[in-house]
């Protein structure tokens, strides 16, 4: 499953990491793939590649067929024994200029024989391009991430447009696009009453795609633990967020 928005600052990485971690806590063997050159998931989970340059960019830039490489590059997380991470790096951006034939299929090919029940892809906030295409080919579902804001609405709108374009392109080729929309993981500030602007944004997003309840509160502990490389669910103050994402995870993970 890919977690996607075309806007920045809409809790996309928080959603991806949270769904992956709560899936592991629920007993699923989980692999989180950081497909964003910002490497936010990688930095948060404090994951280092198994060797120099052996991050997700090695898969996307492979000159030979990378069958099964994901299993080799997935690194065990210290957060949970059932969570592994395929890290990213800034030079992943070099892959965005890659025009090799079938380059967009390398990530999907690498997942062959991966020992995992759940794969979560933290996507870059791109309007298409090789990184997004790689995720679209590899994933069977897309979970949109949004905040209750104008940026959240714009991010979902753009992401849906990209997914629709991908589906139409596959149809023109006579190939089935298997990716489905799982819905929207929605975040809002705090736990108090919704402001008019927040409610308006939520209503606009709901017209685009189903919002997966509950709406997740964004609390100060999230940026604090991200700086420390820790899981907010290990702290009492993080319980409301963990519980909300656990419910979201149960609704989107098959």
Feature names for model-found ranges:
Residues 1-254:
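P-loop NTP-binding core
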């Amino acid at each position: 499953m890919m977690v996607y928005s075309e806007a920045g600052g809409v809790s996309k990485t928080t959603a991806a990491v949270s769904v992956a971690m709560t899936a592991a806590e629920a007993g699923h063997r989980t692999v989180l793939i950081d497909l964003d050159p910002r490497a936010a998931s990688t930095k948060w989970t404090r994951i280092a590649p198994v060797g120099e340059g052996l991050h997700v960019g090695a898969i996307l830039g492979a000159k030979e067929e990378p069958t099964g490489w994901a299993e080799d590059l997935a690194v065990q997380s210290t957060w949970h024994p059932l969570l592994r991470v395929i890290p990213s790096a800034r030079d992943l951006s070099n892959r965005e200029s890659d025009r090799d034939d079938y380059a967009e299929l390398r990530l999907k090919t690498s997942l062959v024989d991966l020992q995992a029940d759940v794969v979560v892809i933290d996507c870059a906030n791109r309007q298409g391009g090789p990184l997004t295409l790689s995720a679209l080919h590899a994933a069977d579902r897309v979970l949109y991430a949004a905040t209750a804001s104008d940026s959240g609405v714009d991010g979902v709108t753009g992401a849906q447009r990209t997914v629709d374009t991908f589906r139409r392109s596959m149809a023109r080729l006579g190939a089935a696009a298997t990716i489905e929309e799982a819905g929207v993981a929605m975040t809002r500030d705090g736990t108090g009453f919704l402001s008019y602007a927040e409610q308006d944004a939520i209503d606009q997003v709901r017209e685009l795609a189903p919002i997966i309840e509950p709406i997740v509160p964004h609390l100060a502990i999230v940026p604090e633990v991200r700086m420390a490389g820790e899981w907010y669910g290990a702290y009492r103050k993080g319980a409301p967020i963990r519980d909300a994402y656990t419910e979201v995870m149960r609704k989107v993970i098959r």
